UniProtKB/Swiss-Prot annotation:
It is found in: Endoplasmic reticulum membrane. Coiled coil: none annotated. Residues 25-300 are lumenal. The keyword Kinase does not apply. One of its GO terms (molecular function) is 7-beta-hydroxysteroid dehydrogenase (NADP+) activity. Its main location: endoplasmic reticulum. It comes from Cavia porcellus (Guinea pig). Belongs to the short-chain dehydrogenases/reductases (SDR) family. The active site is at Y183. It is a single-pass type II membrane protein. CDD domains: 11beta-HSD1_like_SDR_c. This is 11-beta-hydroxysteroid dehydrogenase 1.
Length: 300
């Protein structure tokens, strides 16, 4: 667009001002009251704590994981804590058909959807990579492909509610760590896909926020067991982590960080990347792209 280049500096200044202003907006628990929320990977750990926080805030919650028995306990506790409603649907995110059907069923149970929190994860044993392609494939299926499938299935409802997606990721999706190549690859993929999708939403005026949640080591049973005797860094509390995920998503932040050091967000939250992405978008002929819906497609 010609006007974009003509007023590039002005637009960039407004963009940066909005970016920093939004980061200072205050969270209020009542933001979640009555909201309809899906939480994946919710039978234990961070996902379970997210469900409990949402319940205390008066949200409608549908949780999923593989363990039916564990989910039943989570739902019972959510109702005790004050959830407007709570349901579970058990299944595996290795099954893409289940992932797609789960979203539709959850939407029917709640009568819509305001927030999709993608928290499930497949951990691999910490080891050097020696060509175990099956580990890479499984990591990408569960930690990346299923996130995309769930998001696509949820989009009609989220567009109607102008809702939000939380993509729970890791510092290992921003920088490299030895011994976790398949896991790290899936987390880098989340950043690449969902950050690009966010920019496409902006161009297409789709009012659905995407929050990439960058986590360090959290004191979940699974994470501590996987890293015991190998990784010496501190583990942060899962209860507080879960609350920060909800806050960042409710405030529609592009990224939220919950890591052991307060300096990490400043080191990884790269403003230079934001500026470069903005400048690269100015090189597109958006008039041509947006006027040719048949060729380029659009979210309807």
């Amino acid at each position: 667009m010609a006007f974009l280049k003509k007023y590039l500096l002005t637009i960039l200044m407004v963009f940066l001002a909005y970016y920093y202003y939004s980061a200072n907006e205050k969270f209020r628990p009542e933001m979640l009251q009555g909201k309809k929320v899906i939480v994946t990977g919710a039978s234990k750990g961070i996902g379970r704590e997210i469900a409990y926080h949402l319940a205390k805030m008066g949200a409608h919650v549908v949780v999923t994981a593989r363990s039916k028995e564990a989910l039943q306990k989570v739902v019972a506790r959510c109702l005790e804590l004050g959830a407007a409603s709570a349901h579970y649907i058990a299944g595996s995110m290795e099954d893409m058909t289940f992932a797609e059907e789960f979203v539709a069923e959850a939407g029917n149970l709640m009568g819509g959807l305001d927030m999709l929190i993608l928290n499930h994860v497949l951990y691999n044993r910490l080891t050097f990579f020696h060509g175990e392609i099956d580990n890479v494939r499984k990591s990408m299926e569960v930690n990346f492909h299923s996130f995309v499938v769930l998001s696509v299935a949820a989009m009609p409802m989220l567009m109607q509610s102008q809702g939000s997606i939380a993509v729970v990721s890791s510092v290992a999706g921003k920088i490299t760590y030895p011994l976790i190549a398949p896991y790290s690859a899936s987390k880098f993929a989340l950043d690449g896909f969902f950050s690009t999708l966010r920019s496409e939403f902006l161009v297409n005026k789709v009012n659905v926020s995407i929050t990439l949640c960058i986590l360090g080591l959290i004191d979940t049973e699974t994470a501590i067991k996987a890293t015991s005797g190998i990784y010496l860094g501190p583990a942060s509390p899962k209860e507080e982590c879960a609350l920060e995920i909800i806050k960042g998503t409710a405030l529609r932040q592009d990224e939220m960080y919950y890591v052991g050091s307060r300096w990490v967000p400043y080191l990884l939250g790269n403003p230079g990347r934001k500026i470069m992405e903005f400048l690269s978008a100015a090189e597109y002929n958006w008039d041509n792209v947006l006027s040719n819906e048949k060729l380029y497609g659009r979210w309807a």
